[in-house]
Amino acid sequence: MPNYKRSALISTLSLPLGLLAEINFRRLARLPATIPGFEFPSLSIIIPARDEMHNLQVVLPSLAHIYYPGKLEILVVDDHSSDETAHIAESFGVQTLRLRHDIPPGWKGKPYACHRGALVAKGDWLLFTDADTVHTREGIAKAICYAQTTNLDGLSLFLEQQSSSWISSLVIDAAFAGLFAGWGTANAMLNGQFILVRREVYFDSGGFASVRNEALEDVALGNLMVQRGYLIPVMRGDDIAVVHMYATCKQMFNGLSRLGAGTLRWQGMWVSLTALHIAALISPLVTLIGVLFGRLRWPWLPVSWSMASLSLLPWSRRSGAAKLALLAPFGACVVLLASVYGLISRILGTGVLWKGRKV
């Protein structure tokens, strides 16, 4: 039988852990908005795409209208799509690389597609970005300018997230709150939605070929880069691009199963704070059960629920739906279920189905 009072007490941790998550997020430097005058290097934008015909019809027009004075090429890598991904890419006049042969043994699909794109690309800088990422007109130029003028080896950005439904918005907010509660000072994650790196750094480090069998190739690549001494900070790029992560609730659950279980591996001791924050956000549901069955006095419920809601409020505001913070326990519950499912699937070796593949 659950210890209802202990659960209610755990819920009081959601507020300080939520504050910690917000502090950690705000500590990420925001990419400067100015574009200084200098000679722009050549740039290759690489988009790995598997069954992305619909997303490409949004992202490619956004890239067609970006401001970039330097030499620019856009490369779509069609990763064995079953839809019209390659035809859509070609209709926009961008370079399209079709992967026709089976993925070599020891490789996962996305790192293979990214690496094949890098081998073909000609730019001095490589930008790996996803097909669900819509870019603002000057965003990429700002990123290049900052990385070049500050002598960085590259940079990665956390972007504005937009959801297709209030359910996915709620769940993604809870997932980010948990992630940043356990965001340690030595965190070496990169965000695969926007990874900008110098060409020579990519190939000297081995790039995605060095993390070829990783389901979370961006996180693994970030750790590799840090271990090898490269300077590739993660920054905030709220006004650089917008990401539409999941089209359906099923896709969201599978995506979080993949991300949740995989991210835990890379967070080290900080994962305890992530797990504790998710547990604290969920605990008002246990408190509710305790009140309904007469195990707790009713004042516990508004106290625990209010703390969880206030904890998620900054994330709900950023996603444009502040009222969803009132449903914080339900969002965190989905995050927990998805993460546990992903972890069990990984332990059993069955994997999580993602874009038609087990990862």
Go through the PLM ranges and name each one.
Residues 84, 131-146:
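Acidic donor-binding/catalytic loop of UDP-sugar-dependent glycosyltransferases
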Residues 61-71:
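Short, acidic, metal-binding catalytic loop of nucleotide-sugar glycosyltransferases
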Residues 1-39, 172-174, 181, 335:
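N-terminal membrane-anchoring/stem segments of glycan-assembly enzymes
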Residues 21-27, 100-119, 142, 146-204, ...:
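Long helical/loop segments within the catalytic core of UDP-sugar-dependent glycosyltransferases
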Residues 147-150, 154-178, 200-203, 208-270, ...:
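Catalytic donor/gating beta->alpha subdomain of glycosyltransferases that bind UDP-sugars
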Residues 41-44, 73:
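Cell-envelope/extracellular polymer assembly enzymes that use nucleotide-activated donors
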Residues 78-87, 101, 133:
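A conserved acidic beta->alpha catalytic loop
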Residues 35-37, 271-350:
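Membrane-embedded multi-pass helical conduit in multi-pass membrane proteins
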